[in-house]
Design a protein with these regions (language model features):
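Intrinsically disordered, low-complexity terminal segments enriched in Ser/Thr
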Residues: 1-14
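Cysteine-dependent deubiquitinase/ubiquitin-like isopeptidase catalytic cores across multiple families
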Residues: 18-264
Length: 264
């Protein structure tokens, strides 16, 4: 298997270098969120009211490095989150009828590239947490549980608009921006975007509210392979191999601890 070691420098989600948050022409409602495991772990826990959620760096995508980064004897990998360079003018991919059948019932929202341009990290985590009932169902009274229930009957575009107006989700995002923000925001000059990958009935599904119009089936979990291994293979083939050795990618694993977490 081809070995890939990732460069996991701290990055932020900036889908447009003309963002008001960078130009000083007024502060956008959603500010850039750091991609550190600490920040995203805090985000997942706050959205779900569950301390067992954690986010890990993934340092490489071959089996040995995956096993070092995510010990699935003590936790279960629910999703991989990819941070990758975004491209201006990239078209939105339309999902096929077959994909719609295979992903029926999955929760998906569209990301407005204007108002929600810097919310892609939070959207990726929300997408992951809302679609991993097989790992751990959302608590109905949690911030995200209530938001998903309230918007379940809406279209993906309507859900995106509702997220923009949701104080329950935005307040968590804003608090973590303040806690995590440093000189990174000022020094960041490369646009990046987040997408998440989850399993649905043996399929690896990509959830990207900016560049897909619905859940996209991008791979299969073959017999004898784990979701973690299958999703890592998809990321390698779809994103890293075509990039010809570019290093500005980050992969993180969203995991759920088997045992309760006790914090002092």
């Amino acid at each position: 298997m081809c070995t890939c070691t990732l460069s996991l420098s701290l990055c932020v989600c900036l889908s447009d270098l003309g963002s008001p948050s960078l130009q000083g022409e007024g502060m956008a409602r959603w500010q850039a969120l750091e991609s550190s495991p600490e920040v995203l772990s805090s985000l997942a826990r706050a959205l779900t009211s569950d301390e067992r959620w954690r986010v890990h760096d993934v340092w490489g995508l071959d089996d040995d490095l995956l096993a070092m980064c995510v010990d699935e004897t003590s936790c279960r990998c629910a999703a991989l989150v990819l941070l990758f360079p975004s491209k201006a003018g990239r078209p939105v991919r339309a999902t096929t009828d077959e994909e719609k059948k295979r992903t029926e019932g999955m929760y998906f929202l569209r990301q407005d590239r204007g108002r929600l341009e810097n919310a892609c990290g939070t959207i990726a985590v929300c997408h992951a947490l809302a679609n991993v009932d097989a790992v751990n169902p959302l608590e109905a009274t949690s911030r995200l549980g209530e938001f998903v229930a309230a918007t379940r009957a809406e279209t993906p575009t309507e859900r995106g608009a509702a997220l923009d107006k949701s104080d329950a989700v935005h307040d968590v995002h804003a608090e973590l921006v303040v806690q995590g923000q440093s000189e990174v925001l000022e020094s960041a000059r490369v646009a990046h975007h987040f997408a998440s990958f989850v399993e649905r009935d043996g399929a690896v599904v990509e959830l990207d509210g900016a560049y897909n119009d619905g859940p996209a089936v991008v791979g299969e979990v073959q017999d004898g392979r784990s979701f973690l291994q299958a999703a890592a293979g998809v990321i390698m083939k779809k994103y890293l191999e075509p990039s010809a050795g570019a290093i500005d990618f980050s992969v993180l694993a969203l995991v759920y601890d088997h045992a309760p977490v006790h914090r002092s």
